[in-house]
Structures are given as C-alpha cells and as structure tokens.
Amino acid sequence: MSALAAIQPSPDPARSPHLIWVHRTALLVAFFALLLISFGGHVTTIDAGDTEPAWSFRFWDWFVSWAQLEGGHFYEMTHRQLGTIVGFLAILMVGLMWRFEKRAWVRRLGYVALALIIVQGILGGIRVLVVSDPSVQETAMQATGVADPFGVRVLFGMVHATLGLILFALLIGITDMTSGRWFEPRVRVSERAARLVRGLAVLTIAALVLQVILGAWLRHAGWQVAVIIVHAVGALAVALFVLMLAVVAFGLDRKAALVRKPAFVLAALVQVQIFFGIFSFALPELAPVRTLHHIVGALLLAVSAIIAFRAWHVLESVHEDV
C-alpha cells in the first residue's frame, strides 16, 4: 500500500476544498458575459446603440418597464441589464477568491477582470454620451484628438467591443484555473513540442485580436473595401495558425487531452467562423448571421486563451524526446 500511495499525486496545497464555489461563480460570470457580448453585438449589428440616449450610474433605472421594450431599444436595455448582472456576479467572484483562493496570481487575475468590467461599463456609457451629450462629446474629442463626433463614436465603440472580447477570454481562463482539471498531473512532452504549442497559441491569439479590431472597425465605421480585404487576409492567417496548432497538438501524447481537445474545438470553430464571415459579406441584410460571426469570434479568442494557459501549465517540457 505504501508503494501505491507513493505514486499517487499528492493533493495540491493550493487547492482549497471551497474552490468549487469560486469556479461555479466564475462560470456564471462567463455565461452572462457571453450573453452580454451577444446582445451587445446584435445592438451594433442593427445599429441600436443610440436608441436610449440617457446613461448614468443609476443602473436600477434600466430594469424599469423592461417588458414593454421593443425592437432595438429592447436589445440595448437588455445589454445594459446584463452588464449590471455581470458586474455584481464579478464582485461576488472576487469576494470568494479573496476568501478561498490560495493562489495569489489567480486572485490578481480576478481583480483585473473586475477592474476591466468596471472600465467596460464606463466605456459603454461614454460611447452613448458622446452622441447624446454635447459636453461629453466635446471633452472626448479633446482627450482623443479626434476631430469629428462620428470618429469619436467609432473609436469608443471599437475599444468597447475589442476589450469586451479580451475580457471574456480572461473570464474563461479564470473558470479553467479554478476547475478541478487545473490540478491534474502535468504531462511530459519534448521541449520542441512544448515550444511549438505555446508559440502557435500566442500567434493565434495575436492574430485573433487583430481580427477583432478589424471586425470592430467594419461594424462601427461601416464597410470599407480595404479593411474588408485586410480582414479576409487576416482570416486566412488565423486559419493557418489554427491548423498548425491543431496538427502539433494532435501529435502530443494522448495524456495531453487538456491541450488536444480545445485544439480540436478551435479547428472546428474557425471553419464555422469562415462560413459566417462569407455569409456576412454576401448577405449583409441577415443581421443574425453577422451577430453570430461576432459571437464565434469571442469563442475563438476564449478557446485560444485556454490552450495558451494550459500549454504553459499542463505541458512539462523535457530535453529528451518522450
């Protein structure tokens, strides 16, 4: 029995028995964040961002007469309500992290996520007020150096959209780090394989962030041929990086399922995304397709982040081939 016990992985001292509550709360935050991104994306798709010109920190006003809302106003106000829910859930998540999460670096990521959620809420409010409030518009133009109101509106819309998807990827990463999977034994792989997976994961994330920025440009500033071409070329680059990452990941030991499985999901998602991208260009009047293109973009970035986090945590590189 002593020999058997010796080869069993010992309990990780960083794993609190109460960590399951942090994980469950993080899952709730990520779920509502995806809903938030979905409604926000559709608001942009149907150009409904200015249907409610008023914005303040009186968030409870957004829940009044919600059932009577229609059309774009319904999507805009639901987007704000979901943002409020995400904010309060994130506060709960960070509180549970402070109490039960023993790893300081994970707690810090939680604090960063909460800070970004607050920033996102303020950015969303500024995006509304630069159109409806002349004083905010003038201040924003002076602060950014953008000379026209439309340009300021586009700038804040792009930053709000891009940061939202990056924040979602971070939240998904936190759900993974607080799950039981994170504490499974590491997998030994060759140093070359580990470097390839990590490098390709970072390249994929970088390419996806650029794609998100370009997509936000097209969605907020209107379709421009040059930007569409660059966005299409970027899609090919992302597809190439994902293909290379999938090939390398599938070549890993089967024990590295925590890296192999999300690589398979990523390869499937990129095909779906290309399909939605083509249809968004060919049939721009189909608003749901354009919104789905936005949502799948968020999922691509999130899955890529999971692969990157796991590539550093799960894979243990060794000099000799294993």
Regions found by a protein language model. Give the residues of each.
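A loop-to-helix transmembrane entry motif
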Residues: E76, R80, W223-L240
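Extracytosolic (periplasmic/ER-lumenal) interhelical loops and adjacent juxtamembrane/interface segments
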Residues: T44-M77, T139-P149
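Non-cytosolic membrane-interface motifs at loop->transmembrane helix junctions
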Residues: D148-H160, Q224-H231, L286-V296
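Membrane-interfacial loop-to-transmembrane alpha-helix junctions, especially the N-terminal start
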Residues: V22-A26, A104-L114, L196-T204, A256-A267, ...
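Hydrophobic cores of alpha-helical transmembrane segments in multi-pass inner/ER membrane proteins
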Residues: I85-L92, T162-S179, G234-V247, A298-A311
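Membrane-interfacial, low-structure loops and terminal tails that flank and connect transmembrane helices
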Residues: M1-L19, S179-V197, S317-V322
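N-terminal signal-anchor transmembrane alpha helix
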Residues: W21-G49, Q211
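Alpha-helical transmembrane segments of multi-pass integral membrane proteins
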Residues: F31-L35, A115-I117, L167-L170, L196-A216
